[in-house]
Amino acid sequence: MSASTAARPLARRELHVPRRRTPVLLGLLALATAVAATAAGLAGWTPSFAAGGGTVLHGRSAWVVVGAATALTLALVVGGLVGGTDRRYPESAERDERLDLVRGLAIVFVVLNHINIPSLFQLLTQEAWGPVSGAELFVALSGAVLGMVYRRRLQSTDMVAATGALWQRAGKLYRTALLVVLAIFLATLLPGVDGRVVTTFVDQSNGQTYGLYPNVGHLLDYPVPGYVLRDILLLRLGPYQFNIMGLYVVLLLVSPLLVAALRRRLVLVLLLVSWALYGVNALREVSLLHAQFETPFPLLTWQLLFVHGLAAGWYREALLRGARTAWGRAGVVLAVLGSLALAVFSWNNPFLSNGWDVRLALLPESRFLDLYRQYFLRPTLGLGRLLAVALLLVSVYALLTAYWRPLRRALGWFLVPLGQATLYVFVVHVFFALVVANVPGLGSGNVLLDTVGHAAVLALTWLMVRRRVLFSVIPR
């Protein structure tokens, strides 16, 4: 063996070591910093099990937590910028599993928040990542996936066929929505079943209860009154856990017009029209269909997320190329830091979900509530909330790109299958909400027991997806 041949493996190792060790050392340093700082901040903390209890951190303890979060974020950013390719997402992959994982995370948030029992999971799902909920992510990502799929599809088919496919899917979802609304109502008629969790909605701000199935008892009359059939067909009644489905059906119905605009390269016109409709509803609330979903998800407002997601999916390749440039990387770093800042803002929310919850008190309660009402309300999609959604999606996508292999091993096995069947999960979770509400002990205030209940629902849902239970009936 020649000297040069013998030196090659050594040279490879010498070149390889700094590329691999730097991010590892940064990660270990960040983890140690975060653990130490959080321990210092939470020293002497024990969970409060009183109703509405929890822990609020003031002064130094609160800033220590912020410092730990900042250190961890900066370490992840630096590691992502200087790390090797061995753990990054393989750009040659045909299907973008990063989107599947994020969609899986979003639908898990939706499931846990709709099955509203106080558990440890809620410490992560109730705006812990910023003033964002799973619903916004669900709508935006649905648009992104549709944009990606139909840009490819239109390379091998015409607009007429694409329109037919979109309307066929909208029709299938509409029929599914009708069946779920009726099936839930019939299930509540079974002896011993308490259906209030799906037939009423309690406004937590004032304690007022609203009926979600007005006049539905007349459905059993003969003949059935016309106004009852009208309300059912227009999706003016049904479980609140399911009402966003009506929004999605309407968005799919108008999607051919949106796709046609993108195909003609009228993206700027499309976005301007979308913002104009958003502005109209911000100035004066307009209910076009008087459907149930238009109260929590006003159509003219929430279309903005779907349209921008659609455009991002359509121009995905161009956006990714831009993100790889120096300016693009700088923009991603700013997005990550901005998302962290909004998460810290959200941690100042004075409302505690259960006795294990921890909040910061860096902002006076009145100041936080004023800012939240002005910029971050969910139904009206305040400008701050829209910014938070955009920054969080960019940040999570960048994180998954830089650390794909370890995150895929840790979370992907569970979240990716759910993300590939989000509509299926969304349908079945409504029935799980009814079941959980009728299990003795759940929802009674025992956080650990409720955590087990949430875990059981997630596990059963995952198994149903893996076993493809009723996949031929329920859309995915």
Question: What positions do the PLM features span?
Answer:
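Alpha-helical transmembrane segments and their immediate juxtamembrane cytosolic regions
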Residues: 3, 7-476
